[in-house]
Curated annotation (Swiss-Prot):
GO molecular function terms noted in the UniProt entry: 3-deoxy-manno-octulosonate cytidylyltransferase activity
One GO BP annotation of this record: CMP-keto-3-deoxy-D-manno-octulosonic acid biosynthetic process
Reported function: Activates KDO (a required 8-carbon sugar) for incorporation into bacterial lipopolysaccharide in Gram-negative bacteria.
Cytoplasm listed as a keyword: yes
Family membership: Belongs to the KdsB family.
Organism (species): Methylobacterium nodulans (strain LMG 21967 / CNCM I-2342 / ORS 2060)
Xref: SUPFAM superfamilies: Nucleotide-diphospho-sugar transferases
Annotated Gene Ontology cellular component terms: cytosol
PANTHER family for this protein: 3-DEOXY-MANNO-OCTULOSONATE CYTIDYLYLTRANSFERASE, 3-DEOXY-MANNO-OCTULOSONATE CYTIDYLYLTRANSFERASE, MITOCHONDRIAL
Subcellular location: Cytoplasm
Entry-linked InterPro entries: Cytidylyl_trans, KdsB, Nucleotide-diphossugar_trans
Keyword Transit peptide: no
Protein name: 3-deoxy-manno-octulosonate cytidylyltransferase
Disulfide bonds: none
Length: 247
């Protein structure tokens, strides 16, 4: 594994929080906070890929790199694949990290941890999860559960992803965190595949990879980062960032 590239997909079309990437958090757009966290991970170059010139301008204003992609991509993974072809047509980067643009408080350490399973050449895609500690999350469909076979105390081989409460019986349940590190060839194969049966049923894109026989391993981390999807989430993110600046 060498020379990872972090790509941050961002689009303005969110229905619950319009213009989400540009939402102000302590004086800077949210996408800039995510970009700064990605830089702090120290993995390699960081590029924002977006369908909005205003997002490109916001990132470039702080010295970051951003590329403009088509507005009609069906998923963030497709946006990543287009951006990768623009940024690195020669194929210098063999690992691509997909960091969502709505995680302004994410710990850079877990971004770096996400690539570690790719040291095993049998792994196609790496991701993150955390043990569920709140009872209400066990049955909440918006909390995606990772069902996996333990490899070490902090690493699982993913067998399934579901919105249901799974697996049955005694033992931990894992909250999947939607940050992915792809081998380049795995990303290129993934976006070439049609949506799968289970992907359409669960509305979980990562099932396409599992159904195609690709291997996904997950690193177990301590906490689930705050994702900003609603005005309430945005207020929480502002409070977290304001508290950090006071310390």
């Amino acid at each position: 594994m060498s020379d990872p590239l972090i790509l941050i997909p961002a689009r303005l079309g969110a229905t619950r929080l319009p213009d989400k990437p540009l939402a102000d958090i302590c004086g800077e757009p949210m996408i800039v906070h995510v970009w700064r966290r990605a830089i702090a991970a120290g993995l390699g170059p960081v590029v924002v890929c977006t369908d909005a010139p205003t997002v490109v301008a916001a990132v470039e204003a702080v010295g970051g790199l951003a590329v403009l992609t088509r507005p009609d991509h069906p998923s963030g993974s497709d946006r990543l694949a287009e951006a990768l072809g623009i940024i690195d047509p020669e194929g210098r980067h063999d690992v691509v990290v997909n960091l969502q643009g709505d995680l302004p408080t994410i710990d850079p350490g877990i971004v770096a941890a996400a690539v570690t399973p790719l040291a095993d050449r049998a792994v196609d895609i790496a991701t993150l999860c955390a043990v569920i500690t709140r009872d209400e999350e066990r049955t909440e469909p918006s909390v995606v559960k990772l069902v996996g076979s333990p490899i070490t105390p902090t690493r699982l081989r993913a067998l399934y992803f579901t919105r249901a409460t799974a697996p049955w019986g005694e033992g931990p349940l894992y909250h999947h965190i939607g940050l992915y590190a792809y081998r380049r060839r795995a990303l290129e194969r993934f976006v070439s595949l049609s949506p799968s049966v289970l992907e359409r049923r669960e509305k979980l894109e990562q099932l396409r990879a599992l159904e195609a026989g690709m291997r996904i391993d997950a690193v177990v981390v301590d906490d689930v980062p705050l994702g900003v999807d609603t005005p309430h989430d945005l207020d929480r993110a502002r409070a977290v960032m304001a508290a950090r600046r006071l310390n």
